[in-house]
């Protein structure tokens, strides 16, 4: 009753008010009272942030799920820093790095991935969300919409591509450089490999 009264009074003042709830006191019923859910504290722990935001995505239906604030050390290489973003790609990112303290390649990486997220948020947040194997901490995650598939790999697994997808983004968020995927039928494809700062490192049309 108290939560209903609080919600009603707040929305009467501001109909589009944002009300956030955080783990661990979140469940499907809380969608009645809040329109933002946020993962539990995961300081400098990309894997924990991924697990908690994915758990929330499974429970929250169309309620916006926000990551916990993520940071990294300025002396980390840019690939390691990028993992903080790639592990929460299927939630609303909450960057907590002091931009004036990080090197230029880190800034370029942030610009690239935040632009990517904004351009693809209708897929990442509103598309068909496919989490894999929760017992293994979700070794890959996918989202599909409008004939586009976005799959992020966190472990060395073989990805099966959606046969209806006309564009597929495979994102490598693991320690090894190799990515293995399986096509279910012959197809013509244009292959482009991009580094974590958005630079094209390989491009080929496959007939």
Segments predicted by a language model, with ranges:
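Active-site-proximal substrate-binding groove within the catalytic cores of carbohydrate-active enzymes
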Residues: 2-206
């Amino acid at each position: 009753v108290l939560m209903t009264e609080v919600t009603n009074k707040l929305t009467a003042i501001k109909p589009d008010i944002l009300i956030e709830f955080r783990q661990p006191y979140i469940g499907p019923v809380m969608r009645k009272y809040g329109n933002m859910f946020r993962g539990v504290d995961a300081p400098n722990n990309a894997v924990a942030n991924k697990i908690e935001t994915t758990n929330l995505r499974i429970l929250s239906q169309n309620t916006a799920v926000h990551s916990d604030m993520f940071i990294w050390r300025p002396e980390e290489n840019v690939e390691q820093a990028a993992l903080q973003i790639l592990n929460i790609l299927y939630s609303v990112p909450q960057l907590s790095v002091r931009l004036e303290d990080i090197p230029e390649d880190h800034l370029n990486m942030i610009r690239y991935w935040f632009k990517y997220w904004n351009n693809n948020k209708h897929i990442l947040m509103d598309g068909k969300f496919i989490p894999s194997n929760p017992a293994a901490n979700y070794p890959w995650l996918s989202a599909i919409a409008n004939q586009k598939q976005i799959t992020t790999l966190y472990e060395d697994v073989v990805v099966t591509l959606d046969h209806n997808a006309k564009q597929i983004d495979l994102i490598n968020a693991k320690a090894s450089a190799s990515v293995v995927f399986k096509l279910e039928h012959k197809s013509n494809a244009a292959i482009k490999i991009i580094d974590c700062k958005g630079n094209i490192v390989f491009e080929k049309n496959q007939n």
